Amino acid sequence: MDGRARGGPTPEEQRSTSTDVLVVGAGPAGSSAAAWAARSGRDVLVIDTAQFPRDKSCGDGLTPRAVAELRCLGLGSWLDGRIAHRGLRMSGFGADVEVAWPGPSFPSTSSAVPRTELDERIRLVAEEDGAKMKLGAKAVDVQRDSSGRVSAVVLDSGEAIRCEKLIVADGARSTLGRALGRQWHRETVYGVAIRGYIATPRSSEAWITSHLELRSPEGALLPGYGWIFPLGNGEVNIGVGALATAKRPADAALRPLMNYYTALRRQEWGFDGQPRAGLSALLPMGGAVSGVAGPNWMLIGDAAACVNPLNGEGIDYGLESGRLSAELLGLRDYSRAWPTVLHEHYARGFSVARRLALLLTFPRFLTSTGPLAMRSSTLMKVAVRVMGNFVTDEDTDVVARAWRVAGRVSRRIDHRRPFS
């Protein structure tokens, strides 16, 4: 609903809340943005549909890049009390490879924390920094002034929250993003995934595990992987994820696939019982959305499809994009500035990652390259580094330079570039 000039306030406007910065969504991206904005002295209000703590479909993995962002937020001591993972164990096509996290630009360990705990802890950081919270409130629409700027966000209760600046972090489906004109383009790869929790005596292992040869109960090779992430609390996060496009939709029932994957690993891991708390998700990836910014609003995190197409990771991108969006709040207009920031930080990597992920949706590509790749420890070290988003602009080694060149070339030939 677009705002219009009126002679006086409506009853809804008379009872509306007003804030400088309104953040919609209290997950890692939204709470990160709120914390950094509040630290700069701004008046910040965060709203979220859920009451916290709340669960979220996720592998719970915190990459070294995510660990670095959490430490910047002041959560280093909290993380020190959580499990630390040395690297990634990959299995498939008749081989097993362990690759330590590569560094040196990021911490040497990763972690895994259930989202019920992680999201609440980051939200509390934002609250401790001065951000106000309004939980159990769903944003469904916006009001705009004559210049196209968002003047208020409308809740499902009818209440309007007036704001000068708006950061949208309401997740992959992004109800408010759609109201603002966000479009998801499914011609590039997206992900479908499901996870659960299961007890095991190996819950304190120092390696996360990915099975790259994911097969259906009928034996068909699927474009995806299964994972087991030790949580250090007596359980692991176990799940399966598959890649898809509009032309090649995922042809797998997720819950039966997770149960089958669990059965395959039961003896090896000593699983007790069946996976509990199963949750599935549909994930736009690699910046496959347009309409990520307007005059006074920005989409961040999953709402902006800031998800790695090669591994489905989104927490590190959410934390980073929250911080980066807060740094732009002093600008008058975000329409071009925010897409430019997203392009500078993520477009090269997303472009080439989308192209590689698309190849994985072709069974012949997997069967021909999988066995060769798994038998080369050097190649798998490179794969872990680029798949994990561990290449920075400051890195000058051969792998970093090659990855950046590949990203630039890929972006030039994109039919639709990331975030456009």
Mark where each language-model region is.
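A short, basic/flexible loop-to-alpha-helix module at the beginning of a structural domain
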Residues: 2-18, 302
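C-terminal helical "tail/cap" subdomain of flavin- and related membrane-associated enzymes
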Residues: 327-420
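A conserved beta-strand/loop capping segment in the N-terminal third of enzymes
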Residues: 67, 71-121
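Conserved Rossmann-like nucleotide-cofactor binding loop
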Residues: 29, 52, 173
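Beta1/beta-strand and adjacent pyrophosphate-binding region of the FAD-binding site
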Residues: 13-29
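Predominantly flavin-linked oxidoreductase catalytic cores and closely associated redox partners
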Residues: 125-269
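FAD/FMN-dependent oxidoreductases across multiple families
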Residues: 246-328, 338
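Glycine-rich FAD pyrophosphate-binding loop
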Residues: 38-58
